[in-house]
């Protein structure tokens, strides 16, 4: 990975909210025949005893949906960078069947990776009454999550339960952010490409450093393509280990965050039960508003981190600091 090229990015993933006429542009509705295919594949996978995270296209055949899923991956990899698959009838299936359906579809986009120190490839995003601080992960809280990236090539979310209020999903183009910074504050790119240490939030072995071993660039380029890796909170939480950000670094981060929240930058979406959202983690930043659950039902998402060996943007990311030795970058280093 090398430093950022000082020229505007011209790709399909450079967009603002007004680039889209309506949500219909990113929603792909499942047809009855496609749903039937998925249900048959779910039954076959269950009968064969396949674990959801181990599914592959060959063990989860979807003849009527295969071409559509190929088109969706093209959108995620080379297009706007995100898509929502809508129409899966999650309410008529049990939890295991829903996991098989979600992981089976996701298998056409990439391989499920472990997401945390506990070794979980499938994570429940649900309020566990945990604080969102340097001792826990954001998926355990109902608090607002600022714009950030996750740990692998792609992020997948399946909605199994809606909140009483809040929980809006927001996405924005990291390539558009880069272009805007290049135009408005090009001098900030030095700090953004140098990067920052991240707090590992206890996701490491005893005796290991609580910080990332190296600075993680917010902007870097791999194969000539932008790779954005950002989460401000773990950057600031290094103060608990005796490291303070400089005034200049805080100024750059404040500008970056203000730019993320500039009106017209992000698209918003409300998840329905059965929705499956897939996002290119290296060109899209995502956020979530705070939410409130009802007494009788809760917001419940299931998350996958996916890696695709054919991704043009395949490079290291936050996966390395939360799951040491698990990511492809760590595996490559171990093989050297």
Annotated model-derived regions:
Residues 102-113:
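A short alpha->loop->secondary-structure connector
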């Amino acid at each position: 990975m090398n430093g950022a090229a000082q020229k505007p990015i011209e790709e399909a993933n450079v967009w603002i909210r007004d680039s889209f006429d309506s949500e219909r542009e990113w929603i792909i509705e499942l047809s009855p025949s496609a749903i039937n295919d998925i249900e048959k594949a779910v039954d076959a996978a269950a009968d064969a005893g396949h674990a959801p995270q181990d599914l592959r296209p060959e063990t989860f055949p979807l003849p009527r949906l295969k071409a559509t899923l190929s088109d969706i991956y093209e959108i995620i990899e080379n297009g706007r960078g995100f898509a929502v698959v809508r129409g899966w009838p999650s309410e008529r299936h049990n939890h295991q069947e829903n996991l098989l359906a979600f992981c089976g579809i996701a298998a056409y986009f990439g391989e499920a990776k472990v997401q945390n120190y506990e070794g979980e490839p499938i994570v429940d995003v649900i309020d566990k009454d945990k604080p969102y601080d340097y001792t826990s992960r954001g998926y355990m809280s109902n608090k607002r999550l600022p714009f950030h990236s996750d740990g692998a090539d792609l992020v997948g979310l399946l909605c199994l339960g809606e909140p009483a209020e809040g929980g809006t999903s927001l996405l924005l183009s990291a390539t558009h952010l880069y272009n805007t910074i290049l135009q408005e504050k090009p001098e900030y790119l030095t700090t953004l490409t140098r990067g920052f240490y991240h707090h590992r939030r206890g996701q490491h072995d005893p005796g290991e450093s609580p910080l990332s071993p190296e600075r993680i660039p917010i902007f870097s380029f791999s194969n000539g393509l932008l790779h954005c890796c950002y989460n401000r909170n773990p950057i600031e939480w290094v103060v608990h280990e005796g490291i303070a950000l400089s005034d200049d670094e805080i100024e750059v981060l404040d500008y970056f965050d203000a730019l993320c929240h500039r009106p017209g930058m992000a698209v918003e979406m409300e998840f329905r039960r059965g929705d499956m959202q897939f996002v290119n983690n290296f060109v899209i930043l995502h956020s979530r508003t705070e939410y409130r659950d009802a007494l009788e039902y809760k917001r419940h998402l299931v998350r996958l981190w996916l890696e695709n060996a054919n991704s043009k943007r395949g490079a290291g990311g936050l996966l390395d600091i939360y799951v040491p030795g698990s990511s492809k970058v760590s595996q490559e280093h171990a093989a050297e």
